[in-house]
Amino acid sequence: MGNNQSGGPDARYGGPNDKAGLRRHRMMSETAKIAGQVLPNPDGGPPMIFDDGNEDKSGECPVVFRWSFTQNAQPRVVHIVGSWDNWQTRIPMVKSTNDFSTIIDLQPGQYEYKFQVDGSWVVDDNQGKAQDVHGNENNMINIQDSDFAVFEALDEDFQSSTAGEVLRGESESTKNHDTPNDRELEKLRSFTQEIPSMDMLRKAAGPPVIPPQLMQVLLNKETPESCDPNVLPEPNHVMLNHMYALSIKDSVMVLSSTQRYRKKFVTTLLYKPV
Amino acid sequence: MFSHQDRDRDRKEDGGGDGTEMKSKSRSQPSGLNRVKNLSRKLSAKSRKERKDRDSTDNSSKMSSPGGETSTKQQQELKAQIKIGHYILKETLGVGTFGKVKVGIHETTQYKVAVKILNRQKIKSLDVVGKIRREIQNLSLFRHPHIIRLYQVISTPSDIFMIMEHVSGGELFDYIVKHGRLKTAEARRFFQQIISGVDYCHRHMVVHRDLKPENLLLDEQNNVKIADFGLSNIMTDGDFLRTSCGSPNYAAPEVISGKLYAGPEVDVWSCGVILYALLCGTLPFDDEHVPSLFRKIKSGVFPTPDFLERPIVNLLHHMLCVDPMKRATIKDVIAHEWFQKDLPNYLFPPINESEASIVDIEAVREVTEFQRYHVAEEEVTSALLGDDPHHHLSIAYNLIVDNKRIADETAKLSIEEFYQVTPNKGPGPVHRHPERIAASVSSKITPTLDNTEASGANRNKRAKWHLGIRSQSRPEDIMFEVFRAMKQLDMEWKVLNPYHVIVRRKPDAPAADPPKMSLQLYQVDQRSYLLDFKSLADEESGSASASSSRHASMSMPQKPAGIRGTRTSSMPQAMSMEASIEKMEVHDFSDMSCDVTPPPSPGGAKLSQTMQFFEICAALIGTLAR
């Protein structure tokens, strides 16, 4: 079996060889295009779309509506009607395991809606509600812009989650298992000049064991004579940005550090009298 | 080619442990291909009609006539379907811990995708928002034939939809369970694809951390697709990872021990376990009793059946080496003779280093076409010429260039197979793999970290460099002295934990942003501790919000003195301080711009970030010594 990467087109067109060949040919033509090419798609998938859901309609974004039911009270048919089109259209909802649901594209804002379950008009008590000017009760939803930007939505959810609270130091008793980088943790703390108490230092868990990678010192490596003496071995990424030093000798302190610079690395030394 | 049951199933969401995974499968009904096509076509036509009707209704504020209204209602009655973006949601493939996975059909192309639906409230209460964010961050720009593709992410008020590549062959795990241990050639083919994908991840500074057969899916042609990047993380310069994650049977010893690790070495260990499972049909470390399992992993002793050939045993021992410093690297695995046999060219396209400095105009244009980045081509070009290789535009550019190389090789493969010009390779002469040639060439120019040869005479003459400063006091006393010294020097700090502090000089003005450094106390042995100083680069201000999460996780190199923007293409010489001498060692002189000494900027040259870092270190060391 060859390592054929054109799985998608073959699966779609099945048996006929000429169609498969035609599909491959078209894919190759598409790959060869220069103008208008978004990204090459080796597997012939849909073109890469890099947006946050704001599709062809200006400002309209998808909103999920659900009607949940229990196993012993399953409705036969559910529709939803809402103020987004002035209550004009009864939209049928699709049945799934535990609910009926649908997705409607809406502009951000406030909307009222109602469900029709097996012919009866119903308001879901578990979703937001409001009364209209005629005194009727409807469900109500408020759509924000930030709900449709993926990373903004996730950041909001993270801030209000247990992990977010723990990282800000607000509730230290709660244990959380979502452990991001220390860099993410740093963004949540503020600078101070308050010295932690000795009691706090003693209660803390001990410092971590030093990783073996840090004990590999770049400048301690012997360079073979065939190499340029100014060329050092390629460091791995965890060795970068750390400070290495020589013992103070003849009243001179010597420090060094290696940083990434474009596709190379630079090691800088400082000789400083003390 | 083994024939296996064709199940239309995508991978299940994995909660990070085997115990939490819900095994609920949904199988699509077998049906005639023509009938399915006709049905899809009808649905597509209805979808277009529906949109047209909705637009006209929205555009008109008038009340429609009774007849028209009835007609509209009747049409609406027929179209009970869910559409997200351009995809119509179909049957459920499975239910994971965080939500369902459904089949999606692209409404115009009829292309099939997998739609993972994550309920925002549920992922928040389960405390995995960060995990989801990392998966989206790390996966959205990846393009590799053996990594599952994330086409699109759509956020709604209640749910997040991840539009992913649909893979119909099931899990490699089920394949091994069904077939038992595989023949060498088949196992090698799978393993080569896995290593190619993992190497791609590492080249782009992403470590997977949850590699196991359950997360390796198979497509129709039995090719591997690496999936589930929920435990992955971005590797940043100078930083270690510590999270003990992944499945116990596949986790490296340092991970289950809670030690710090760099990243790639734990993926190598997991790949070693997978290779063993492919060849033997069992796991090298296995025990129902978790403490016993952990003891086995830490011992690194595993059974080697007689049917395993000697080269494979050597490779397995090198990959499943307990000491991460002695463990095989991805490069070692790729260079291994067993791995090199029957290795397809497309898996490791040659890196043309002579072109590394040439800007690919097409790739620049493609970066600008991303809707997320509303930028001009000049901005992309200046980002590439700037001093920040982790700029989000540079990242996007490099991914596109890398993806083009892979796509070119894959296209060549398709052409070859289409015309059947070259039948299956016979035992012809073995050509050296480009990676090997590059490695052998580079080894002559650049020494490696493994070179431990030293002459006695030179050793006596040369002083030894050491990391940070050492002490044999108690850790709490060391840190207390450090805090006191910092206060004396008028520094300020953030306490991440009592032994990890972020430090900077107190700014003279609110607008000033002095460079920061990280202090971390490490334990060296029972009575010895080491205070490590690490420079932290400035975060670039004004970065795009969509990339801020990724950008913040990146470590940035030092900026040249006096110039902080990314538009400059020159690096002025750092100003020499009075009574201090700077010596710059450049690893490779091929980049001649490092030797250029342009005049300092008109605004007056400042100290480079590296020099400022050195000054803070020297001041703190001096104060502590007193």
Swiss-Prot record, chain B:
Residues 542-555 have a biased composition (Low complexity). It catalyses: L-seryl-[protein] + ATP = O-phospho-L-seryl-[protein] + ADP + H(+); L-threonyl-[protein] + ATP = O-phospho-L-threonyl-[protein] + ADP + H(+). ATP binds at residues 93-101, 116. Belongs to the protein kinase superfamily. CAMK Ser/Thr protein kinase family. SNF1 subfamily. Residues 38-49 have a biased composition (Basic residues). InterPro entries: AMPK_C (IPR032270), KA1/Ssp2_C (IPR028375), Kinase-like_dom_sf (IPR011009), PRKAA1/2_AID (IPR049020), Prot_kinase_dom (IPR000719), Protein_kinase_ATP_BS (IPR017441), Ser/Thr_kinase_AS (IPR008271). It is an enzyme of class 2 (transferase). Keywords: ATP-binding, Kinase, Nucleotide-binding, Phosphoprotein, Serine/threonine-protein kinase, Stress response, Transferase. This is 5'-AMP-activated protein kinase catalytic subunit alpha-2. The gene is aak-2. The modification Phosphothreonine is found at residue 243. It comes from the Eukaryota. Residues 1-24 have a biased composition (Basic and acidic residues). Acts as a sensor that couples lifespan to information about energy levels and insulin-like signals. Role in motility and response to oxidative stress. Involved in the establishment of germline stem cell (GSC) quiescence during dauer development. Plays a role in axon regrowth after axotomy in PLM neurons. Plays a role in the maintenance of glycogen stores which are necessary for resistance to hyperosmotic stress. Plays a role in the regulation of flp-7 secretion from ASI neurons. Expressed in the pharynx, the ventral cord, neurons including the hermaphrodite-specific neuron, body wall muscles, the vulva, the excretory canal, and weakly in the intestine.
